């Protein structure tokens, strides 16, 4: 493209001016909404124009992270996650609600304990985090059924359409959940500022009406009727314009879409496919919804990983810190005003809540690990970007222009996208034209500034863009009234402290940078080396040039101190808001941003507040760490770190410096091998004496499932009988006539499922599973049978969750689990009479604390023996490391004590060894919560983190395992251990354990 004409630049600048009312506060320019009509919608707190949201009258960039409370069933840990996201510079969290967990039985909505939303709202409010509520009814989310409860398989209507049967099925759930969300809205003093009806309503087939305005309007009306008054936003799966404002019935207030541009090939984490970097989002936005702020409701922050995949460490390497630099700054180049990163904390698919395409871990390669660590470099990189945006309110006033390979950079190897302001600052996003490039490219810039068009660097040398990197260069950037004419180094943050100002800049290793400040003052290097540093006055501007060094420099120009850092050093800096007390952190606003301080402190800084003459920091440490406070208020004299008064020194630049000594505690964990394991055969169904008279009969002549018609005399679809989760067991009775030689059975459990079949006590064989197979047809040869004798076929199926329902019209979620068809050679199918079971009670599930999906249909699960304190004293002593000598399923339980010192966040993991060739499957229960499904022959997961609150760090714990040997030689665990990673000295409040009801004899258990 050729250089933008003067007219084009002027047009962009004019658009950037907008028509907002503005006033000054602490050096910030606050932009208030200019349109009274949009202030008086259903509420006055959250409004918008074409550039951004306004919250409480202030223009605000929403930088958000996706978190699912149901994937961390310890409510007292939610604050920890919120504080770590707040520390990124973010101001919002988006969350799904999983319908399947709240309405396990039609008409019975239950949202208590771990499933209650109110504690999630309270934690968000305490951390100063706004919320975007996304309760569906459909969520996708890699959740079982896409969040749909299994009983929807029986709905006589097409899902996600205006079919009356489906709409009626959603009424109870949405009425309850939306009413709960409504109570948490900003209008009621809560954190919820946006509400999303439906999710990714973006594609259809099979003659379904689409897009169906009547359907979307129904979902919207459900929310509004329940009290939702905040703006409604949608999440289109691409820039398709579905339900955008102006499209008529079913339109939302604000249009948004998602994007996962790098894809999900974690097996090749270094491969960035050609052409995958978005380039048209600005044009798409102006086409689809030009009157609303540009909104990316889900932008890639990691990747899912299937059964048999490379693992989430590889996913974190795929969507890594380099990805963030290139892709997130590219999002900024389009003027993104609502940017939500999916996932920022992934969590765990505990208790069978995941879909068949994934395993127990939902780490997602996110910035926060599954165990809530912030040790991935991508977390630190994201903190640089988040705090830059937070400190740059003029970004929202700049108008994005077209990307170009000429006119700004002096090489076509680089592409520059301008965001031009009108006296409010401009931004220039630079990347490689071939975004996959790993070359280091030298360049100079031609920048339009208030001092004219300048070629940068002015003092000689060149800039460098390293491979898989991107930069945001600022022009006429306002730092509390001081004009930064330009900076090639990137801005981390800036602050005004009393009569001085601080600007923090950073660059990559070995880079050369230049800064120009519209001041006449002299330049002083007040800390660090003068080598490889030059400065010059050019008319009314001071120009400074330097080579990036690992050693910090502080340069003073007038009342402005400029911290020059390398990127790795910048990772250690934090910008906590300065709160009034320790009760809560304020929401992000111009005022709270202006009152923040800057802290250098390593692993994590959570909060800062003043009380009397003291400055109080709450922070976490994973090593001995130097601590510095930049901008301590003038009225404080004492420093407290995690409540302890700390001595400090004050240098000539007013920086407080001290240190925190780290000495890891000795963590003594029990040996799992040495526990007093008790054993129970949890497949008594194959014993000749077993009585299944109490079991539900599979006696339905028809199926209500509209997706798959019956091919059997009776339905064997598990959801027809209310069984939607975990292991299924079928028992088929027949009287032999002597001709039976084979049994064919087609079972379906979802990707990577397994099954085993017995005839009486004779093992016939197993399908050990493959990720590629959601169902499988097996043929088993029968032993010789005697005419007139009774026989029982026992079929065990490991179901892996219900399919998602992304494409409207497919009703894919209705794909049944269980036996799809069977044939007993020489006999009619009606010769077999079937019974089946899943979890005890099915939809009348027994454990209301752990929810409707947590347990399956094995004998020990039906009895509740997986819970603490089962009646195991008289059971046989046997270890899962000795295992089973033949096919079958064993149940093992043991107790152990932990004594983890308080004040330490110690991630714990149950690790399985895996060197045997025999296929086996394990379920891991911890204090009654199913926290792992291990499949030896598929993987990849062998390490299962379990959080404090599920594990009792100071007290007694119960661990239970189900071990399913699928092959004739049996199976045993190669190894099983409880391990920890680096203890973190934490300011985290005391963790309250989730409820862990003990075993009680269950009425009607069979």
UniProtKB/Swiss-Prot annotation:
PROSITE patterns documented for this protein: GLYCOSYL_HYDROL_F35
Pfam family, one: BetaGal_dom2
Family to which this protein belongs: Belongs to the glycosyl hydrolase 35 family.
UniProt-annotated catalytic positions: 200 (proton donor), 298 (nucleophile)
The reaction(s) this protein catalyses: Hydrolysis of terminal non-reducing beta-D-galactose residues in beta-D-galactosides
Protein name (Swiss-Prot/TrEMBL): Probable beta-galactosidase A
Glycan attachment points: 156, 207, 373, 402, 422, 622, 777, 914
Recorded superkingdom: Eukaryota
Keywords, ordered alphabetically: Carbohydrate metabolism, Disulfide bond, Glycoprotein, Glycosidase, Hydrolase, Polysaccharide degradation, Secreted, Signal
Compartment(s) of residence: Secreted
Disulfide-bond pairs as recorded: 205-206, 266-315
Gene Ontology biological-process annotations: polysaccharide catabolic process
Binding positions for substrate per the UniProt entry: 96, 140-142, 199, 260, 364
One Gene Ontology term of the molecular function aspect: beta-galactosidase activity
Function field: Cleaves beta-linked terminal galactosyl residues from gangliosides, glycoproteins, and glycosaminoglycans.
